[in-house]
Amino acid sequence: MNCIKQFLLAICFSLALTCQDHVLVGGTTTRDIIVPKISEWQVTVVNGLTTGETLFIHCKSKEDDLGEINLKFRNRFSWNFGENMLHSTFFWCYMNKDNGHMNVNVFWDDVILFHRCGWKNCIWTAKTDGLYLWNSASGEDVLSRKWEVGW
C-alpha cells in the first residue's frame, strides 16, 4: 500500500509540473510555488585599501576554485552562482595585503547574511583595518573581521 501511495504522489507531482503555468499576484507563478527557484547570488570583493596597495585574493568553494586575483585600489572582483538545493553552498577567500592577511567565509547559508546582502548581492570591502560587509538593510559597511598581522 505504501508503494501505491508513493507512486500516485509521484504521478500527481509530475502532472503539476507539466500543467499550464498561471501567473499570480506579484509575478509569482504556480510553478514557482510547486518548484521554488534556486536563489541566484552575486558575491563581490572590493579593494578599498586607502593606502593604495594591491589586495591579493583567492576565493573558492568545495566545487569551484575562482583563481588568484590581484586587485588594485578601487577595483572589484565578482562572481555569480545559484545556491544548491541542499542549501550548503559555501564560499571562502584568503586575502592578503602588505601587513595583514585573513581567511574569511564570504557566502554560506544563513538568514542573517541573506538579509544583510539584500537576498541577492554580498559586497565585501577590504579596508585598512579589516573586511567590511555592506549591510543593504542599514545602508552601511559593517566591520566583519580585522586583519591578522603578518603574511
Curated annotation (Swiss-Prot):
Record key words, sorted: Secreted, Self-incompatibility, Signal
Locations listed in the record: Secreted
Pfam families: Self-incomp_S1 (PF05938)
Secreted in keyword set: yes
Biological process per Gene Ontology, one example term: rejection of self pollen
InterPro entries: Self-incomp_S1
Tissue specificity statement from the Swiss-Prot or TrEMBL entry: Restricted to floral tissues.
Signal peptide: 1-18
Keyword Thylakoid: no
GO cellular component: extracellular region
Origin superkingdom: Eukaryota
Family membership noted in the UniProt record: Belongs to the plant self-incompatibility (S1) protein family.
Protein name, entry field: S-protein homolog 1
Organism: Arabidopsis thaliana (Mouse-ear cress)
Name of the gene encoding the protein in the UniProt record: SPH1
